[in-house]
Amino acid sequence: MKTSVSHKFSRDFTKSCIMEALLQLMHSKDYNDISITDITSRAGVSRMAYYRNYRSKDHILMDYMCQIIKEYAAELEGPKFFSDFQTYDHILWGLKYLQKYKDYVLCLKKANRAEIVLYGLDLYMLHVTQSVEKSSLEKYELYYYSGALYNIFMHWIEDNMQEDITVIASIIYGHVQHHRFHDLHTQMENKEKNACNFDKL
């Protein structure tokens, strides 16, 4: 058990070093000019360690985006995470959380890899609604919402966050109040009631 925990810690540390090295290099070099040797030298890891964890530079950036989403989900885990993801407080919390990764987002933008942020938001939307049955059309509505969040967030970051974060959250909330997934909490409550009734049969 201790060996397994130690191995995971070692792997996570290696991945963290690689990610940090890539971000540092993205500040000073063109993304396409960054080599695997550049990354491993800056990170202080071997090429073997690199290829044990990643297939490419894009893989590093996407893996980091997934980590961000997973950590965010873990912080908000519970009924409210799944039922209230379109409330003002949740939107504001999400913006503040992403704001912490401004440097990462700007690096993605500079490298023409900003779509990785959209990829992360799409994953997030599907995750928070996983307990609700969705048709294909409803999934497209979620993609529409994540696309809107992506555009607003990216432009806000590019504008050096001149508008107060509460103003941005209010704008987003104002537009999602009438979104059909705004009734997600009701859908989940009905589903739970039906499950309870079924158990009594």
Model-derived regions, located:
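Short, basic, alpha-helical segments at the C-terminal edge of helix-turn-helix-like DNA-binding modules
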Residues: S35-I36, M65-A73, P79
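Basic, helix-initiating cap at the start of DNA-binding domains
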Residues: M1-L25, R42
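Hydrophobic alpha-helical connector segments
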Residues: E77-Y104
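Helix-turn-helix
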Residues: L25-H59
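Basic, amphipathic alpha-helical hairpins
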Residues: L23-Y31, E75-G78, Y101-V105, Q130-E133, ...
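Hydrophobic alpha-helical segments that form the core
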Residues: K139-H179
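Amphipathic alpha-helical packing segments from all-alpha helical-bundle domains
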Residues: D89, K110-G147, F181
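N-terminal intrinsically disordered/low-complexity leader segments
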Residues: M1-R11, H185-L201
